[in-house]
Amino acid sequence: MNPLEDSKANPFEIAKQAAAVIAEKTGVAQHDIALTLGSGWAKAADIIGETVATIDATEVPGFSAPAVVGHLPTIRSIKLPNGKHALVLGARTHYYEGHGVRRVVHGVRTAAATGAKIMVLTNGCGGIKETWAEGTPVL
């Protein structure tokens, strides 16, 4: 059972636990920026820097395997050219999946707990127009 399903559990404590696991598994004590890349955007992480570590999301408290096509089951730590570290969240939960808001915002809470002061969110928005494929940029 995901610990966020327990209504008595403190979601901020679970985010701190998740951040501790991420620090342990990546060897990176603090991340400076976090990115949630929408469907089709995973390759963007490959060009922003050097991957330090890739973690199976199910090994991190509060995260689970993605239920949406195009999402990755991973959390990555990337060293940027300026020496800072980016946390890339491939696994996340959408509200329409029916797990509640606590699981939806867990990635952002965890990113903040890792030290990230900047969060970049992207989405695939593939359902808006049939001619758009995964990764089509929309502003």
Task: Enumerate the language-model features and the residues they cover.
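Metabolite-binding pocket within alpha/beta catalytic cores that recognizes anionic/polar moieties
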Residues: 2-139
